[in-house]
């Protein structure tokens, strides 16, 4: 669905055409087809897309095995960085903002194909529920626990002050649903990233 800003007809048509060009260009990259949709008027522009598809082999979250490594295809941090930017755009330098945009525009198709070639048992995307929720689901489904080391290498931006101060919508719910299932050995300054909602986040492999 497309949320089109309240405007005159010609301007509304411009937004419609502009949005659809962008949506179609991304769909083509992932060998997808836009088959239906609707639009409505709103105070702010917005795009919501629902993806449907078929699969040749079913992969569940219960197939993890002891001793396997955990891999993230991209760094984390879109949630709190966008929250900081919308609060005050000057909190992010132009370089940091462009870096954020580059990662948000980077798809997961290629890494997904690589994952399949290595016969990865589990591949799931880190979404608005955050890393902790997705990893916890895998552990519970597989009857295992996981150990991860939080360091700045998993962050898009290593400004710890911003990470500690800003939280996007969804952080509170993510924390309340997952925090009691996680044990943090030390008071790690990066722990908020576990519950940070991701937009076009990485694959957890």
Regions found by a protein language model. Give the residues of each.
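Internal active-site segments that recognize and position negatively charged phosphoryl groups
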Residues: 70, 108-111, 116-122, 127-130
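Glycine- and other small-residue-rich loops at beta-strand/loop junctions that grip anionic moieties
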Residues: 62, 73, 100-104, 124-127, ...
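Active-site glycine-rich loop that binds ribose-phosphate moieties when present
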Residues: 50-58, 92-116
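Glycine-/charge-enriched secondary-structure boundary and capping motifs
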Residues: 10-33, 40-45, 52, 117-119, ...
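Glycine-rich anion-binding loops of enzyme active sites
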Residues: 1-91
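Short pre-catalytic strand/loop immediately N-terminal to key active-site residues, enriched for Gly-Thr
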Residues: 95-103, 121-122, 190-193
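Conserved S/T- and glycine-rich ATP-binding loop of Class I adenylate-forming
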Residues: 67, 125, 205
């Amino acid at each position: 669905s497309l949320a089109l800003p309240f405007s005159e007809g010609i301007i509304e048509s411009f937004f419609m055409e502009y949005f659809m060009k962008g949506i179609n260009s991304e769909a083509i990259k992932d060998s997808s087809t836009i088959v239906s949709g609707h639009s409505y008027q709103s105070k702010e522009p917005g795009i919501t897309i629902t993806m449907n598809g078929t699969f040749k082999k079913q992969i569940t979250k219960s197939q993890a095995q002891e001793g396997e490594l955990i891999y993230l295809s991209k760094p984390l941090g879109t949630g709190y960085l966008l929250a900081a930017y919308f609060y005050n755009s000057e909190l992010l330098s132009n370089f940091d903002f462009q870096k954020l945009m580059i990662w948000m525009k980077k798809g997961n198709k290629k890494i997904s194909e690589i994952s399949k070639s290595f016969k990865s048992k589990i591949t799931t995307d880190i979404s608005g529920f955050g890393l902790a929720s997705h990893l916890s689901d895998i552990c519970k489904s597989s009857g295992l626990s996981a150990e991860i080391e939080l360091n700045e290498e998993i962050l898009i931006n290593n400004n710890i002050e911003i990470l500690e101060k800003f939280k996007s919508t969804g952080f509170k719910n993510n924390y309340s649903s997952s925090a009691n299932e996680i044990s943090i050995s030390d008071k790690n300054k990066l722990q908020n990233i576990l519950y940070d909602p991701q937009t076009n986040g990485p694959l957890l492999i």
